Amino acid sequence: MIKDIIKRDLSVPKLNDSAINILAVMEEHKISHVPVVDENNKFIGLIDELSIINMNNIQHPLSSMKKNMKNIFLVENAHIFQSIQTVTSHLLSIIPIVDENHIYVGYINQLDIIQKIGLSHTNYDNLNIIVISLHKKDYVLSEISRLIEENNGKIITLWQEITNDKINVHLALSCIKCDIIIKTLERYEYNITQTFSSDYTSNALDDRFESFINYLNT
C-alpha cells in the first residue's frame, strides 16, 4: 500500500487562492502539479503549471481555472503499482491521495514510489510482481522461494505488509513465464491476490513501467 509514503508537507491551495501564489508553491517543492481543495479540504482537482502560466491574469483565483483541473488521484489504500500506472499515464510530478470520503490527505511523488519498491538498480526485463496473502503461521519464505526457483524464476526483492493475523508478501520476480509460477503457487494453496507485469502485453502494467523506472534512474 502507499499509506506509509504519503507526504503532508504541502500547503494545498483552495479555489479562492490566487494562481500566482501557486507558482511559488510549485517552485518551492520542485513540482509541476498541485492539488486543489475546497474549504472542507475535499479534493477538487489537480492543476498543472502550464495551465496557470497560460492564464490571462495569474492574479485571478484558481476557481477561474476549474475546468482545467484534472480529476486524478489515488485512495490511500491503493497498491504501490497503481501509483506507477497513474504517474506514467498522466506524466505527473505528484499524485494527490484522498481518503474514502474524497478528503485530501497528502501526496506521493516519483522518488517516493521508486524508493518504496526498492528496484532502483534492477534490470526490468521480465519483471513481474505478485502479491501473496496468507496467515502469519503459514508464511515460510524458503518454500515460496523454492517453488519460484523450480519454475525458473528468481526473487529480486520483496516487502511485507502485516494486517491483523495476515501478511501480504509482495514479490518482485524475474521470470519469463510467470503464469507457470502463479499456477504452481496456487496449486500449493497460496492465495495470489494481485499480479503486475512489465510485459507490454499485460493488462495490469505495461511497458510504461520500464520507461518510468528508466526515467527516474537518469
Question: Which residue ranges define each predicted feature?
Answer:
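Bateman/CBS regulatory modules and CBS-like beta-alpha motifs in cytosolic regions of diverse proteins
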Residues: 1-25, 36-38, 43-44, 48, ...
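Short acidic/polar active-site loop segments enriched in Thr and Asp
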Residues: 32, 93, 154
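Hydrophobic, helix-rich cores of sensory/ligand-binding and other regulatory modules
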Residues: 107-110
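A short acidic/small-residue loop/turn micro-motif
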Residues: 51-52, 112-113
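A conserved regulatory-domain signal marking ACT and ACT-like small-molecule sensing domains
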Residues: 126-218
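Short beta-strand/turn micro-motifs at beta-sheet edges
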Residues: 116-121
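Solvent-exposed alpha-helical segments within well-ordered globular domains of core cellular machineries
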Residues: 3, 7, 24, 85, ...
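N-terminal, positively charged regions that mediate nucleic acid binding
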Residues: 26-30
